[in-house]
UniProtKB/Swiss-Prot annotation:
One of its GO terms (biological process) is maintenance of protein localization in endoplasmic reticulum. This is Protein POLLEN DEFECTIVE IN GUIDANCE 1. GO terms for cellular component: endoplasmic reticulum lumen; membrane. The gene is POD1. Residues 20-63 are annotated as: Disordered. Residues 33-42 have a biased composition (Polar residues).
Amino acid sequence: MAIRSSGRKLSFEILSQNSSFENDDTSIRRSSSDPITGNVASESPRDYGKRKRSKKKKKKVNQVETILENGDSHSTIITGSSGDFGETTTMFENRLNYYGGGGSGSSGGGCVVTLLDGQTVHHNGFNFGELRQRNVNGSVDGSNDERWSDTLSSDKKLYMEETSVELSPSENPPFQEVQHQFPRSEINGNVVRRLDTEASLDWKQLVADDPDFLSAETRSPMKYFMEEIYGGISLRSTTTPGNDIERERIYDTIFRLPWRCEVLIDTGFFVCVNSFLSLLTVMPIRVLLIFMDAFKNRQFRRPSASELSDLACFLVLATGTILLGRTDISLIYHMIRGQSTIKLYVVYNILEIFDRLCQSFCGDVFGALFSSAKGLSISPPEKLRFSTWRFVSDLALTMAASILHSFILLAQAITLSTCIVAHNNALLALLVSNNFAEIKSSVFKRFSKDNIHGLVYADSIERFHISAFLVSVLAQNILESEGAWFGNFIYNATTVFFCEMMIDIIKHSFLAKFNDIKPIAYSEFLQALCEQTLNIRPEDRKTNLTFVPLAPACVVIRVLTPVYAAHLPYSPLPWRMLWMVILFVITYIMLTSLKVLIGMGLRKHATWYINRCRRRNSSHLHND
């Protein structure tokens, strides 16, 4: 028999005395972990001879043992008796629990289960107490009946008082469990009270307000249908009414945020174009001035950090252009177009992934190179050798990373050109797969505000790379196409840019919606970009537009060089050299004019927008 005591199970076995073992005492096994007090009262044993003379009488063994566990007063009475008809084992368990934080003591009554001749009578008294009387292989002695009659009657009275149920003395109901919601006590004696949940309270309130609510299933179909018609909103079971905040979110997603996002991406695109033009126009002049100054002074002078950085960039640009010039573009074109293992849009997506990886890595490498150049310029004489080797190693790593990035961009440009000139809707497949894969990889993820800031800058760089690819496609059409090709090129270029713009708007609109980003955040991103344009860079800024235009410049120079070579006149070498110089000067003037126009426009726009943001912050306005 297993007894539950105060939330902890006491495993012990009660071995009742059988009629064939009359000389043995009833044994009780307990676990060693249960402490037993010495309060054990046992009836005095009779003499062996005296028991032999009274064979017709059965011995009576009364053992009263008290087990104190976990602060509970727990008494157990186990009586083994034998009568004329067999043997009966009775156990009474009485506990005294202190609960409610130990403030007040409360003692419980008992529960009596009596098994008589196959019939079971179950009585409930107080909680915590149990009185069980079971018939084993016989009936009950009369002395034991008298012994427990008082207990049964008292428990029955307590049961009637607790449950207010009247039972006749002759009534012998079948076995049934009557459970009461008593407080459940834990091991430490505290009481775990049953708490009603909010849902149950709402349900009780609903039933109290509408007594006919539970009888809805008995109503007629016509009455149900009329209630559905006049009950309110048709979709009230699956939708909830919104508020002004939800309305603002809708208009932010559709109108306000797309405009601000597009302005930010376009501004970032022109910042990339300005950096690209600075590489092609400003940097050659600076390098030329460095050599002229060295030739004029005719003595060695340690260059400054900016001069070392310009020399390193010029060396990387020249090396990448020379290596790409050795590359056969037509061979790569036919290799990509002729293979049938991988689709063109898959190749483009793979190259785009490597492009982003190389863009991030090249930004870090160039940052390390510029830091080494600064260290070399201010290095003391005793550390000059170490600083020089450090600068050379960073320059070699930068050159390798930039050349690898240049080859990836060239392959990506050739793949896009292959899709455009194909006649099997390869461009449409490329745009659909690439753009919707971008939406899938971005929209349904959790982004922080800084991550979205960096994602906007990545979209600006991507648009610049697409522009460089379209320049490559234009150069290829100039060299190889026949007939009216310009209109078809404009249509394809417009399609590519329009799809890219729409995908960026959709992506950022739902990113802002799912991540609870307000449209004012994109205005803050634009303000940070304008401050970067004006070289106002706070030290604690986490996100800046990092763009290294060396790899795109190598690709553009590589694809435009054959176009210039094809339009040179067939004349002697001096005239050809003269025409080359003229074309170079014209191109440089055009690029310089474009650089001045874009640079001044960016600075003017940045100054205006920063002043506007300051006025907005001072007047607490939130509209662009």
